[in-house]
């Protein structure tokens, strides 16, 4: 299972919060102090909290659970997609569509349409219809791919959300809360930690910090799954130790 040290966090700038005038008082327990009117996050709190979150993600991976990585702002978008793909999970990195979780039935219909367009693009259907119609379908397919491409193979609601910037993704957090889906989230000094089950107090803007969170989370989910695979192989080969 992945773990992250204080040195790793310092190098990535996890400890730099937002300007003091933008703070959310609910983040006070996680703030060490201020320097040049910028809040400094207490990494002595962040390190154990993040490692606890990673241990839980490994358990979800071990149970073959589904983790949905969410980060739609520019600094997080590409890293969110990479983390999800690397861990064979799911992502939303463009725009959170209202009802993506709470109205998943309707979202499923859009995913079905996306998959139909993908088949048509491959099987020659687009060549048999008018150029105008083919162009309209291509544009519709690209738009759907942008919004839903990261969840088109999710087949049901996720078992957890891993969110970069709880404040920016507050709609996703609220939908998960309504459905009882656990939320793991990076929460900066300007954000509200309410509704987050596993709070990771930290910088949610620096690309290096974002990559640190996502790489560790993806590695934890993967290691949980691999443990399960290793156990299955050992059992098959007769190497299970007697208790």
Swiss-Prot record:
PROSITE patterns: RIBOSOMAL_S2_1 (PS00962), RIBOSOMAL_S2_2 (PS00963)
GO biological-process terms attached to the record: translation
Any one cellular-component term (Gene Ontology): cytosolic small ribosomal subunit
Residues of the signal peptide: none
Molecular function as annotated in GO: structural constituent of ribosome
InterPro entries tied to this protein: Ribosomal_uS2 (IPR001865), Ribosomal_uS2_bac/mit/plastid (IPR005706), Ribosomal_uS2_CS (IPR018130), Ribosomal_uS2_flav_dom_sf (IPR023591)
Keywords of this entry: Ribonucleoprotein, Ribosomal protein
Entry's family note: Belongs to the universal ribosomal protein uS2 family.
Protein name: Small ribosomal subunit protein uS2
Organism field: Aliivibrio salmonicida (strain LFI1238) (Vibrio salmonicida (strain LFI1238))
């Amino acid at each position: 299972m992945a773990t992250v040290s204080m040195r790793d966090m310092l190098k990535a700038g996890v400890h730099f919060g937002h300007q003091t005038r933008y703070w959310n008082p609910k983040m006070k327990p996680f703030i060490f102090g201020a320097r040049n009117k910028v809040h400094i996050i207490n990494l002595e709190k962040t390190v154990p909290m993040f490692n606890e979150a990673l241990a839980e993600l490994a358990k979800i991976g071990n149970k073959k659970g589904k983790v949905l990585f969410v980060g739609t702002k520019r600094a997080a978008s590409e890293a969110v997609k990479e983390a999800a793909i690397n861990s064979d999970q799911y992502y939303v990195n463009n725009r959170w569509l209202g009802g993506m979780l709470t109205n998943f039935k309707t979202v499923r219909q859009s995913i079905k349409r996306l998959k139909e367009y993908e088949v048509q693009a491959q099987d020659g259907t687009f060549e048999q219809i008018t150029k105008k119609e083919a162009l309209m379908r291509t544009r519709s397919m690209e738009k759907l791919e942008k919004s839903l491409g990261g969840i088109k193979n999710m087949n049901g609601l996720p078992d957890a959300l891993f969110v970069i910037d709880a404040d920016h993704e507050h709609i996703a957090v609220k939908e998960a809360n309504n459905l009882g889906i656990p939320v793991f989230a990076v929460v900066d000094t300007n954000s509200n930690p309410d509704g987050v089950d596993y709070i990771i107090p930290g910088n949610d803007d620096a690309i290096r910090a974002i990559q640190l969170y996502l790489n560790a989370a993806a590695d934890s989910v993967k290691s949980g799954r691999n443990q399960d695979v290793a156990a299955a192989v050992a059992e098959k080969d007769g190497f299970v130790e007697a208790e």
